[in-house]
């Protein structure tokens, strides 16, 4: 198991949930956190603990974002007109690495970040190597022609455990994904419940 894979599954164990719905998650075999004290029964969380956990789960889901990265996205969600929690989800789903993951071009959000950083992705025909790049409605994201036969891409396209959401129009023959619209929370195919409203409560008090 690579360090990246180990870190990913550590997030699952820390959250106590198989947050990406992966068949290989250790949470499919045991239901306790990492470390020597992981098997201790957890008590009921306080309001603060529940809010913190909701924030950590979202940060982890999108590739274990740093607090600085996540706080910056949240601050923008606050500035935009509308519900802050919904805005937060929309901004996270507009990240280029998230689009690559949702389109099933790669198997994990961690692989998506690395894939973008290594220059395998184009947006509207121009190479973009910034995972946090924010796509707009109508943008066409594609895998560069020289990268389309990579094993990681071919294997991911065939994965049965994930479906492509309807806010993307994906052509796996041409390896393109059009970002149709910014999704609402209910549109996003999370494997577990995400609660951005609790994230809003967390930052309102801290």
Curated annotation (Swiss-Prot):
GO biological process: ribosomal small subunit biogenesis; translation
Claim: Cell membrane is one of the keywords in the record: no
Region listing for Disordered, in residue ranges: 23-47
Molecular function GO labels: rRNA binding; structural constituent of ribosome
Cellular component annotations (GO), alphabetically ordered: small ribosomal subunit
Sorted UniProt keywords: Ribonucleoprotein, Ribosomal protein, RNA-binding, rRNA-binding
One Pfam family of this chain: S4
Span of domain S4 RNA-binding: 94-157
Top-level taxon of origin: Bacteria
InterPro entries given in the database record: Ribosomal_uS4, Ribosomal_uS4_bac-type, Ribosomal_uS4_CS, Ribosomal_uS4_N, S4_RNA-bd, S4_RNA-bd_sf
Stretch forming the signal peptide: none
Subunit and partners: Part of the 30S ribosomal subunit. Contacts protein S5. The interaction surface between S4 and S5 is involved in control of translational fidelity.
Function: One of the primary rRNA binding proteins, it binds directly to 16S rRNA where it nucleates assembly of the body of the 30S subunit.
Family: Belongs to the universal ribosomal protein uS4 family.
UniProt-recorded name of the protein: Small ribosomal subunit protein uS4
Gene it is expressed from: rpsD
